[in-house]
């Protein structure tokens, strides 16, 4: 289920103070958070960026192997994005496009990789639930918070990504929108 929330993704706090929040965003496979919402993730969660960049560099021989996967990273308690007194945020890097800029993939390819990345995230969250308390709805759906992924620098019409996200009925997806 998708719920639209007007406001800043980075002010989100879980309903239970002991629960972990999941913040997801679409990423390239080249280790760059240099534009769009990724730059805000970089400022808020520098420890997660380092892990992401290092992970991408270990796949530098063929970064496209990361497409359709998700890297789920626990941020550091010292990251500025954890200032709201909440539990540590987990950053989900959805590898939806190999490159960025003019070399980004087509909207159809990005949508297909989003579907695969979300399936991978869903699997990882099921495992993580066995070890940690993750923010969930009263119906038991894990809450995933995100901006309108792919709609910025990857230039995918939102309706295409929205159709993909609507397939994940077992997840409660908060999509943050800013005017």
Curated annotation (Swiss-Prot):
Keywords: Hydrolase, Protein phosphatase. It catalyses: ADP-alpha-D-ribose 1''-phosphate + H2O = ADP-D-ribose + phosphate. It comes from the Eukaryota. InterPro entries: ADP-ribose_metab_enzymes, Macro_dom, Macro_dom-like. SMART domains: A1pp. CDD domains: Macro_Poa1p-like. Highly specific phosphatase involved in the metabolism of ADP-ribose 1''-phosphate (Appr1p) which is produced as a consequence of tRNA splicing. Belongs to the POA1 family. This is ADP-ribose 1''-phosphate phosphatase. It comes from Debaryomyces hansenii (strain ATCC 36239 / CBS 767 / BCRC 21394 / JCM 1990 / NBRC 0083 / IGC 2968). The lineage of its organism: Eukaryota, Fungi, Dikarya, Ascomycota, Saccharomycotina. The gene is POA1.
């Amino acid at each position: 289920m998708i719920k639209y929330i007007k406001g800043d993704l980075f002010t989100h706090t879980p309903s239970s103070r002991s629960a972990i929040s999941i913040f997801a965003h679409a990423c390239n496979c080249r280790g760059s958070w240099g534009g769009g919402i990724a730059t805000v993730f970089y400022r808020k969660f520098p420890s997660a960026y380092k892990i992401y960049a290092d992970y991408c560099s270990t796949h530098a021989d063929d970064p496209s192997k990361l497409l359709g996967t998700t890297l789920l990273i626990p941020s550091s308690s010292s990251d500025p994005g954890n200032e709201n007194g909440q539990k540590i945020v987990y950053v989900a890097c959805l590898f939806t496009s190999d490159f960025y800029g003019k070399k980004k993939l087509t909207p159809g390819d990005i949508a297909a990789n989003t579907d695969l990345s979300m399936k991978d995230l869903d699997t990882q969250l099921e495992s993580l639930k066995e070890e940690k308390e993750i923010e969930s709805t009263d119906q038991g759906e894990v809450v995933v918070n995100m901006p309108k992924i792919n709609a910025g620098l990857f230039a995918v019409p939102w309706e295409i990504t929205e159709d993909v996200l609507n397939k994940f009925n077992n997840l409660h997806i908060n999509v943050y929108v800013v005017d």
